[in-house]
């Protein structure tokens, strides 16, 4: 009989630690809703004590999501565990996830604790967590570099103290598949009470082995896999959820394992996370990359045309990457538009639908065909970013033998503010004018433009990242006019920075 594994998604916690990623509350909620549709078993919403924002997002997920376990990470420290419980207590299925490092190098240089002190701390904090919550996960940080006999003792002791899941992380992506699989097997064989808890794994990708190590662990008895959408995470990232799941699905003959994931929701989850984090998916990324199902070689093309399975071991449709459906145009009504949004996985408020529909009608006047990708770009552009400043109008004068100038008018409440500026090209001039009009000085650290669809009337999507007050803020803008898309993106990022930091950053 096939074993069933659990998928623990940490996109909103470990994934958000990707450099330059800073999700707000509404964006986290949108991603979490998609993760529920995807069918993950556990969502780690954040690190409750790390910041008020993390605490609020975990509590919001706990109050709003059903059919999924909500977890908060916490150190093996009393105040951390107390705060984690405050955040997850309203969840239908709450989990406290506590950790402490167990490797010699971490104990000596980071914790400055002995093995016995670490063991005692781990046990006492699991007991404290268990006093709040029946579902407690314990992680032995840097387990793959921990002395195995000590690791067995820690795992046995925390299970006895009440841990229902024990996580074995490859924290620095140091292990190899054979080695990591053997470690999981050794834990099963050397921890007497291991049958009273689920074995979980959390693999990092520093050597490009996170997915391979995770699958090796599953093969050797791991019950839960911790992963992120698109493999997001600090340094080289985490094991990619989509690669683990499709590896298991494609090789059912080998793994004989089941799970709850609806694979047709994978591509939508990947695009949503990419859009809201501003982290592009590489074209040759397995499963969800733009080239994942592309065939350029003549021999390969001939084979696929004759019989798809000659070169395709899975179908685009199996991960929700079907052909674009060209179903809406300028004569489409709001009802049809709203139905299409629901089919695409969006759950928007009436006001958000109204705003998105207005943008859709405006785009439909400029484009012959509006595709699903266009709609995604329109909706994702302004998810949950308060419009403190709104573009009223802009004008550009630019050429190869003149200084580029821009005049931008923005609206704040009922006031229209107009400013002009010069710059090195039309985009720079427009950004300088936006800064003068808003009174916010920022440093542009990233600018990217891409065509959402094909053709001369394609929608252009601009992503910018600005640095303000030692934080990075992302903005997105879409338009058939790339200058307008750029202005929208820059203003979007400025609005986000004001929302996060406060209006004190606006110079008078």
Curated annotation (Swiss-Prot):
Pathway: Amino-acid biosynthesis; L-leucine biosynthesis; L-leucine from 3-methyl-2-oxobutanoate: step 1/4
Annotated CDD domains: DRE_TIM_IPMS (cd07940)
Cellular component GO terms held in the UniProt record: cytoplasm
Name of the top EC class for this enzyme: transferase
Requisite cofactors: Mn(2+)
Keyword Amino-acid biosynthesis on entry: yes
Transmembrane residue ranges: none
Main location: cytoplasm
Catalytically driven reaction(s): 3-methyl-2-oxobutanoate + acetyl-CoA + H2O = (2S)-2-isopropylmalate + CoA + H(+)
Cellular compartments annotated: Cytoplasm
InterPro entries: 2-IPM_HCS-like (IPR050073), 2-isopropylmalate_synth_dimer (IPR013709), AIPM/Hcit_synth_CS (IPR002034), Aldolase_TIM (IPR013785), LeuA/HCS_post-cat (IPR054691), LeuA_allosteric_dom_sf (IPR036230), LeuA_bact_synth (IPR005671), PYR_CT (IPR000891)
Entry EC number(s): 2.3.3.13
Signal peptide: none
Entry-linked Gene3D superfamilies: 1.10.238.260, 3.30.160.270, Aldolase class I (3.20.20.70)
Keywords of this entry: Amino-acid biosynthesis, Branched-chain amino acid biosynthesis, Cytoplasm, Leucine biosynthesis, Manganese, Metal-binding, Transferase
GO biological process, one term: L-leucine biosynthetic process
Binding site for Mn(2+): 14, 202, 204, 238
Residue ranges of domain Pyruvate carboxyltransferase in the record: 5-267
GO molecular function terms noted in the UniProt entry: 2-isopropylmalate synthase activity; acetyl-CoA C-acetyltransferase activity; manganese ion binding
NCBIfam families, per database record: leuA_bact, PRK00915.1-2, PRK00915.1-3
Functional note: Catalyzes the condensation of the acetyl group of acetyl-CoA with 3-methyl-2-oxobutanoate (2-ketoisovalerate) to form 3-carboxy-3-hydroxy-4-methylpentanoate (2-isopropylmalate).
Protein family: Belongs to the alpha-IPM synthase/homocitrate synthase family. LeuA type 1 subfamily.
Annotated protein name in UniProt: 2-isopropylmalate synthase
Gene: leuA
